[in-house]
Swiss-Prot record:
Listed transmembrane segments: none
Residues that hold UDP-N-acetyl-alpha-D-glucosamine according to the record: T13, G14, G15, N125, R161, S189, I243, Q288
Origin organism lineage: Bacteria, Pseudomonadati, Pseudomonadota, Betaproteobacteria, Burkholderiales
Keyword Protein transport: no
Protein name: UDP-N-acetylglucosamine--N-acetylmuramyl-(pentapeptide) pyrophosphoryl-undecaprenol N-acetylglucosamine transferase
A GO CC term assigned to this protein in UniProt: plasma membrane
EC number(s) per entry: 2.4.1.227
Enzyme class, broadest EC rank: transferase
Pathways per UniProt: Cell wall biogenesis; peptidoglycan biosynthesis
Amino acid sequence: MSAPTILIMAGGTGGHIMPGLAVAEVLRERGWRVLWLGNPDKMEGRLVPPRGIELVPLRFQGVRGRGAAALLKLPFLLARACAQAWRRLADIRPDVVLGMGGYVAFPGGVMAALRRMPLVVHEQNAVAGTANRWLARLARRVLSGFPGVLPRGEALGNPVRADLCALPEPAERYAGRSGALRVLVVGGSLGAHALNTTVPQALALLPEQARPQVVHQAGEQHLPALQQAYAQAGVQADCRAFIDDMAGAMAQADLLICRAGAMTVSEVAAAGVAALFVPFPHAIDDHQTANARFLSDAQAAWLQPQATLTPQWLAQWLGQRTRQELQAVAGRARTHALPRAAAHIADVCEQAARRAS
């Protein structure tokens, strides 16, 4: 008997691709054949093939925010992508199709539904993306990382790395710590200019004996400017382009200052670390603010809009934090973790395939 086949559709950003890869790994361990529908010219073209997963090419990208000329081309681009997806699905004949978001998932999902192939959709963010809002109407099962995102949605969580889920409980990690608070600042692989400029200036406003120990990840492109910003502020910090062991860095931190992508928020909960979220203000539909509120509304994190993140505000806010308070917030964050999300999404895919057979 041949192995069952799943076609995963995801692309454009790591927030769609990485959770898809986590589900792919679970299904491969269960004996499934995994194929990936994506644009070889985009991020999935760099991330998926090195994992030993065949990338089935489909070139399609969104036109939102690209102007009137791009919008006029949309019907032609979409028709071409749908024709490509129809042929790819005919060749592959997958037992189930999983859409994890990104524009490339839309034509593939529509064609899968027209071919009456079981379609499962997973939305990572607290505000559904354009493709998933439409595909949810066609899907057999609708899954999400956060509650209340889509009609018929089942909140199974976002797949996160096992090393984060395996960290000891916050009470155990924070116990016995003394001295300056340990702050981890993460701007993502490309850095975050607002954090890179505001944090050094804020720390300079604090008395030297009240300053936390800082590890600040800025992205390779922004590292020299970040180091200069700390030097000009007269503040010592461990500035890094990348952090290879993010689980270890989170385990050592009393506080994380970061953006609020869906995966970041889910990782904060999985690790059980206190976080100050500064959502990226230009995210589509302001979805990062909605992501952050999943924890901040439960007093399991803090949320500060970038527009009001000033050095003066941040200095005052940091000066008011205690390790005991941070431990309590970290503990509340951990209660919102869904560490088996990847396995549960894989379960749903298997169920959908069985019901269609």
